[in-house]
Amino acid sequence: MSETFNSSEFLKTVTSSPGVYRMYDVDNIVIYVGKAKDLKKRLSSYFRKNLTNVKTQALVARIANIDVTITHSETDALILENDYIKQYMPKYNVLLRDDKSYPYILLSNHKHPRLSYHRGPKRAKGQYFGPYPNGGAVRESLHLLQKIFPIRQCDDLYYKARSRPCLQYQIGRCSAPCVDNVSLKDYQEQVALASLFLKGKDQQVTKALVAKMEQAAVELNYEQAARYRDQITALRRVAEQQEVSHSSGDMDVIGAHFASGVACFHLLFIREGKIFGSRSYYPKVPVDTELSEVLRAFMFQFYLNSDSQRVTPKEILVSDAFEEQAELAGAINTAQQRKVEIKSQVRGERAQFLRLALTNATNAVNTRLAHRNTVEQRFLLLEEAIEVSHKIQRMECFDISHTMGESTVSSCVVFNREGPNKADYRRYNIEGITPGDDYAAMKQAISRRFDKVAKAGKTPDILFIDGGIGQLRIAQKVVDEKFVALDHAPTLIGVAKGEGRKPGLETLIYGENEESFTLPADSGALHLIQQIRDESHRFAITGHRNKRQKTRNTSTLESIEGVGPKRRKALLQHLGGLQEVKSASVTELVKVPGISLEMAQTIHDALRG
């Protein structure tokens, strides 16, 4: 506890009301957020002389100030606590890191509705189906829908620009409503069936299609009957692949496992009796935290996330009971205006779902621990190989990528003792250098990374440079200049490619004295270096390709007189990309907003000339 914080004087000012408290350290950073039914009683418990919990002892030792917010009820305190945890991300709270909004399938409100992937605020008009557990589940569902229902998935600009059916029509994935190839009635029938399918009404869809097939056969329209038959076959094939429960309805099933500091919550999303999808969460857990606290924190943060657009089902099954289970159900009721039951003691089919979720959570934790142990072992071998006197906590690696000097990008990837730390990855677009000058590119990237070294975030213990002695010298010079007034500077090591660029033949070079050395091809230390080098290369080349494509799209149209930024953007958006602009006819170009007949002819001639 800070010398300036007097706990006894502070406690005299605290009431016994419900509320939320925020604990600050000497740097005025929030280190813990908590809630209490009785603030005075709860806060007093932190300052007892016989504290046994190691985590609580460490927390109390850092307290310099405490702010208190009184609420009307304990439920209000629960919701405010969750909001504060999300806002401040305190060090001593369990933090749910994966907080992306859930994706949906959107069926647009259009004359010819479109099926599309949607994530974010629901601003567009139409029907939303979901939420889905992840983006992969949405893309898989859209791919499946295309095979069964010939509904367009192109954007509206592309739809408006068509004068002939696209490839999706040729392969039977779209009925080409853009060129009136299907009647409005038939298209709307398919939209209605797709909507029922997305709501889980598979049997109703099948019955409707069987009736249509029989009617078409009676009318001797055998071609149409065959199309309905193919749809029915595809639907039944999908139904056979899905595990269906006719008694379970909608529910979330959560398996929780916690071991050696790694926690996993595996969620099964059961909708209309089917396993709709699954997702694993790995919250950040402070040292010496117990499973009960981890479980409580996860449940509250997951289900009281005000930014999430997911609708909580009426039933939640969880593998372990936790404190304030009833309070969470009440808070969900208050926040979402729906009654929810949370259960951990279930039988029959529900118990089978729980066992499945728990098995997945346990396997996920074991896999992570095995990976962490492998990475940890490689770190130890690296420390031994390069003879450092301290533990390596953070490593960074830089790489440069370009094509003949075009669209130069530098990457900086970060590894810690658990593996890649992707949240800290950075890319630098290199500007103002002679094209192809890798030395200048490296100098600019390293300079920007450590431009304000005191505010540069975590300083790496080891800085790898993917390149030879020349790039290493440049990087070492920049680091020496940036860290001249500081005690601790990173150790630089160059990773020069071996003969024929074969893995295992790399030469490693110390930046400080330029001594070179090699490691055995089967060395775990070398494998770790290769891993961070390859990851840096992947991250750099991905960024370079994206930048190059964007530049080429723009520069090709920039050369055409009269085509400014607005017209370039309209052309690319309306027609779907540069290749589509190049292949478009004058008639198609005229349909783009802001493009006259004369301008369309100019663009057509310039791109075909």
Curated annotation (Swiss-Prot):
The keyword Isomerase does not apply. Signal peptide: none annotated. Residues 203-238 form the UVR domain. Residues 16-94 form the GIY-YIG domain. GO terms for molecular function: DNA binding; excinuclease ABC activity. Keywords: Cytoplasm, DNA damage, DNA excision, DNA repair, Excision nuclease, SOS response. PANTHER family: UVRABC SYSTEM PROTEIN C, UVRC/OXIDOREDUCTASE. Belongs to the UvrC family. This is UvrABC system protein C. It comes from Shewanella piezotolerans (strain WP3 / JCM 13877).
